């Protein structure tokens, strides 16, 4: 039993050493590739859609609130034809969580 434990510890030690050597070699090559990609990267931020504005053109374009991103809700208004209307809105749960966080910030300081 002691021999089995000794060999398993030895095996794990050798395995972890060999895997770290392979990872170190991979990391150095990956870092050079990543740096060259980052040098060529361009910022492509598009304008976000403010709260309560129409987001039917891009349903993932709603702006962020203090903590959470607003959600694009689509609905069919009553009395009109079957035209879908979408707007960026803050879910009630997110509103309550932001209020609790604001209260906690004022209490804690």
UniProtKB/Swiss-Prot annotation:
Region described as Knottin domain: 45-88
Record-linked Pfam families: Toxin_35
Any GO CC annotation of this UniProt entry: extracellular region
Location(s) in or outside the cell: Secreted
Gene Ontology MF term list: calcium channel regulator activity; toxin activity
Top-level lineage group: Eukaryota
Region (Linear cationic cytotoxin domain): 89-108
Domain notes: The toxin is composed of 2 domains: a highly rigid N-terminal inhibitor cystine knot (knottin) domain and a rather flexible C-terminal linear cationic cytotoxin domain that forms amphiphilic alpha-helices.
Protein name from the UniProt record: U4-lycotoxin-Ls1a
Species for this entry: Lycosa singoriensis (Wolf spider)
